[in-house]
């Protein structure tokens, strides 16, 4: 089939049940392995159904039935996911585990106040080679990606040129 598809990990407590994205599910003690294996199975199912491999994008499902620790483990393992055959989408925008960064400091927290943390995750994900990111505040995240690109370019950065696209692996930040 010629239609692009994004396959996201979302394990529920009951097979076939769709509920709240909050909370956690049993990932067999290793969320990274569980997400890898599930996304691989989903991709193989899509290929078997006739979806072309160049139309498949994978998403680890940050925040969907995962604890904050699960989400951080998945972000730390992002390079492992990027070694896979398919492009990776990182959807961390305004997730509770990012808002919790502020709570840990004892300051006001809300999903809206997680935009700076979202921008940081966006810039790091783009720098690592993520195919794309899902964000609410495009300008803030775009600035973060462009700052990281300028930083990496150093003296080669010419200020007036668009910085995106300069990362290894050809990522453009997807914002």
Regions found by a protein language model. Give the residues of each.
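Active-site-adjacent loop and "lid" segments of alpha/beta metabolic enzymes
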Residues: 1-45, 49, 65-162, 167-175
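Short acidic capping loops at alpha-helix termini that bridge into adjacent secondary structure
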Residues: 53-55
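Acidic/histidine-rich catalytic cores of soluble enzymes
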Residues: 62
């Amino acid at each position: 089939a010629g239609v692009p598809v994004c396959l996201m990990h979302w394990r529920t407590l009951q097979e076939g049940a769709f509920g709240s994205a909050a909370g956690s599910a049993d990932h067999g003690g290793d969320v990274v392995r569980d997400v890898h294996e599930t996304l691989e199975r989903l991709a193989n199912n899509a290929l078997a159904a006739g979806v072309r491999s160049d139309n498949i994008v994978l998403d680890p499902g940050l925040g969907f039935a995962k604890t904050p620790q699960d989400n951080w483990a998945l972000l730390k393992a992002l390079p492992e996911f990027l070694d896979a055959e398919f492009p990776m989408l990182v959807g961390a925008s305004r997730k509770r585990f990012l808002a919790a960064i502020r709570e840990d400091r004892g300051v006001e927290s809300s999903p809206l106040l997680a935009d700076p943390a979202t921008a940081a995750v966006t810039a790091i994900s783009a720098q690592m080679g993520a195919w794309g990111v899902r964000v609410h505040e495009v300008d803030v995240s775009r600035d973060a990606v462009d700052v990281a690109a300028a930083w990496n370019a150093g003296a080669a950065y010419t200020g007036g040129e668009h910085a995106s696209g300069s990362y290894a692996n050809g990522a453009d930040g997807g914002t």
